[in-house]
């Protein structure tokens, strides 16, 4: 079994060694320009145009990340980038859900326990106990109710926060109030104190966190963007922060990455930044998922996490 591999930064030797443990008869081959030899599967991240074009012999393509927007967005320019009829799969929960829960929970608690406010008091050498927030007044709204969004929402619900989610279609999540579709977005936003974004990147969700949406949040709201930078209109967030509508923001993703040095987000006192590290692909978990998926395909089954190219996720 031959498996093509392309990632601009991952070390193929580590992936090859891990794959041997799960699929001893598989051979991982680093794709190089001009490599047109046959292969059974492909593992890719930001693949060059010539890598996959015309490879209709592939049984499946695995994108080495939870999102596939960077791949699908190129189809408008290169319609033949992906070979016709070959299923595409994504890494949906290869350790990413646990990482995302850790990140989201830590930040919600940071705001809930008013650590930003206490840090400001410390800079002024002021000893001043503040009125504590109540869980009932700290409504959390999660945009996106897939595997990542759903698990984040349920984790926060178990901690006593009132939690709601909004997605394309209604989802039944224990302890979470569900909203769906454009007609229910306003109701979802009403009263939301903490907005967590875990939406997929599709044409419908680009720029969704804009001035109109931010204005519909509760006063002194908080914004946590963990999905994609294109979801957020950064200028609108800065304006909402300066007006006091939004009290604080934690951003892991940006319209342009790396975030340019001149971006005002770097220097805003109520914005915290991390460099797209909320949930990363861990080789051990990713290889185990890929091996299980390949085993299922070889048996004639369809693994989970197949991408609907038309929907974009």
UniProtKB/Swiss-Prot annotation:
One of its GO terms (cellular component) is cytoplasm. Keywords: Cytoplasm, NAD, NADP, Oxidoreductase. It catalyses: glycolate + NADP(+) = glyoxylate + NADPH + H(+); (R)-glycerate + NAD(+) = 3-hydroxypyruvate + NADH + H(+); (R)-glycerate + NADP(+) = 3-hydroxypyruvate + NADPH + H(+). Signal peptide: none annotated. The active site is at residues 228, 276. Transmembrane segments: none annotated. One of its GO terms (molecular function) is NAD binding. Its EC number is 1.1.1.79, 1.1.1.81. It is found in: Cytoplasm. It is an enzyme of class 1 (oxidoreductase). PROSITE patterns: D_2_HYDROXYACID_DH_3. The keyword Methyltransferase does not apply. Belongs to the D-isomer specific 2-hydroxyacid dehydrogenase family. GhrA subfamily. Catalyzes the NADPH-dependent reduction of glyoxylate and hydroxypyruvate into glycolate and glycerate, respectively. This is Glyoxylate/hydroxypyruvate reductase A.
């Amino acid at each position: 079994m031959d498996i093509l591999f392309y990632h601009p930064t991952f070390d193929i030797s580590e992936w090859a060694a891990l794959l041997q443990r799960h699929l001893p008869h598989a051979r991982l081959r680093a794709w190089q320009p001009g490599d047109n030899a046959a292969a059974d599967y492909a593992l890719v991240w930001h693949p060059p145009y010539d890598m996959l074009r015309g490879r209709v012999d592939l049984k499946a393509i695995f994108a080495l990340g939870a999102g596939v927007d960077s791949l699908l967005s190129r189809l408008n320019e290169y319609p033949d980038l992906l070979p016709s009829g070959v299923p595409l799969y994504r890494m949906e929960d290869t350790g990413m859900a646990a990482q995302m829960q850790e990140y989201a929970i830590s930040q919600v608690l940071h705001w809930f326990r008013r650590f930003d406010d206490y840090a400001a008091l410390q800079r002024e050498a002021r000893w001043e106990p503040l009125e504590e927030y109540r869980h009932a007044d700290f409504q959390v709204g999660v945009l996106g109710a897939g595997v990542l969004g759903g698990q984040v929402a349920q984790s926060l619900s178990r901690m006593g926060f009132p939690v709601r989610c909004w997605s394309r279609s209604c989802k039944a999540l224990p302890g979470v109030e569900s909203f769906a579709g454009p007609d229910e977005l306003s109701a979802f936003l009403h009263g939301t104190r903490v907005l967590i974004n875990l939406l997929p990147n599709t044409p419908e969700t680009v720029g969704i966190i804009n001035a109109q949406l931010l204005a519909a949040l509760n006063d002194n709201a908080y914004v946590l963007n963990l999905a994609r930078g294109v979801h957020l209109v950064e200028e609108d967030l800065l304006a909402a922060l300066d007006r006091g509508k939004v009290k604080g923001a934690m951003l892991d993703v940006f319209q342009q990455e790396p975030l340019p040095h001149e971006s005002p987000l770097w220097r805003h006192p109520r914005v915290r930044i991390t460099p797209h590290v909320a949930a990363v692909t861990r080789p051990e978990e990713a290889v185990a998922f890929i091996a299980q998926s390949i085993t299922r395909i070889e048996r004639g089954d369809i693994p989970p996490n197949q991408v609907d190219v038309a929907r974009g996720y």
